[in-house]
Design a protein with these regions (language model features):
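Enriched for short, Lys/Arg-rich terminal
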Residues: 69-70, 74-104
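A generic local structural motif
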Residues: 49, 68-69
């Protein structure tokens, strides 16, 4: 049975930042990338544990195949919340200081 899926304001902002950045060089590629990220995330409705366990307790990571992007999310009951979207080359804050990610 599908679960509810929501994007945090931070995740929405990060997706838009990614789209805007790629759009500087190639607007069509930016749209394709954003569409791909959203499509892969939508699979979490049916497979909420599709991603691997993350470094933070309770956080899961979904690698967007064919891109360097990783989606951080958490599952609570019948709800999946997308916390943020990272470029794989970005430096993450050390555990305990990841202010972007909710504590679960």
């Amino acid at each position: 049975m599908p679960v509810d899926l929501t994007w945090s304001p931070l995740a929405r902002a990060r997706l838009e930042e990614i789209r805007a950045y790629v759009s500087l060089d190639n607007p069509a590629a930016a749209e394709r990338l954003a569409t791909r990220i959203v499509a892969v995330v939508e699979a979490l409705r049916d497979y909420p544990y599709l991603g691997r366990a993350g470094a933070e307790p309770g956080i899961r990571e979904l690698v967007i195949g064919g891109t360097p992007h990783i989606v951080h999310y958490h599952v609570r009951g019948k709800r999946v919340t997308i916390n943020t979207v990272w470029h794989g080359a970005q430096r993450k804050e050390p555990p305990g200081r990841a202010r972007d990610l909710p504590r679960v």
